[in-house]
Amino acid sequence: MTMFVESINDVLFLVDFFTIILPALTAIGIAFLLRECRAGEQWKSKRTDEHQTVFHINRTDFLIIIYHRITTWIRKVFRMNSPVNDEEDAGSLLL
C-alpha cells in the first residue's frame, strides 16, 4: 500500500511539474529575454537596416505572445485545481 501511495505522489508531482512548474520557468525565461530585447532597442543605432528592425520587432512580439499564452495556461490550471464556483462554467476552463 505504501508503494502505491508513493507512486501516486510521484505521478502527481510529474503532472504538477509539466502543467505548472515547467511553464512557469519558461515564462520567467521569456520575461528575461524580453527584458534583454527591450534593453537592446534603447542602444540600437538609428542606422539599422529596415529588415533587421522588422525581424527584431517580430521576435519581440512572438515572445510576448508566448509569454501571455503560458501565463494564461498557468492561471487556467490553477483555476481547474480549485473548486469551481456556481457562476463559472467548468467547460470554459478547458483550453
UniProtKB/Swiss-Prot annotation:
Changing N81A: Increases accumulation of full-length MifM. Reduces misCB/yqjG induction in misCA/spoIIIJ mutant. Changing W73A: Increases accumulation of full-length MifM. Reduces misCB/yqjG induction in misCA/spoIIIJ mutant. Its main location: membrane. It is found in: Cell membrane. Changing I65A: Increases accumulation of full-length MifM. Keywords: Cell membrane, Membrane, Transmembrane, Transmembrane helix. It is a single-pass membrane protein. The chain crosses the membrane at residues 12-32. Residues 86-89 are annotated as: Crucial for elongation arrest. Changing Y67A: Reduces misCB/yqjG induction in misCA/spoIIIJ mutant. The keyword Transmembrane applies. The keyword Membrane applies. GO terms for cellular component: plasma membrane. Changing E88A: Minor effects on translational arrest. Changing I70A: Increases accumulation of full-length MifM. Reduces misCB/yqjG induction in misCA/spoIIIJ mutant. Sensor protein that up-regulates translation of the secondary membrane protein insertase (MisCB/YqjG) when activity of the primary membrane protein insertase (MisCA/SpoIIIJ) is limited. Acts as a ribosome-nascent chain complex. When the primary membrane protein insertase activity or level is reduced, the membrane insertion of MifM is impaired, which induces arrest of MifM translation and unfolding of the mRNA hairpin. Unfolding leads to translation of the downstream gene, which encodes the secondary membrane protein insertase MisCB/YqjG. This is Membrane protein insertion and folding monitor. It comes from Bacillus subtilis (strain 168). The lineage of its organism: Bacteria, Bacillati, Bacillota, Bacilli, Bacillales.
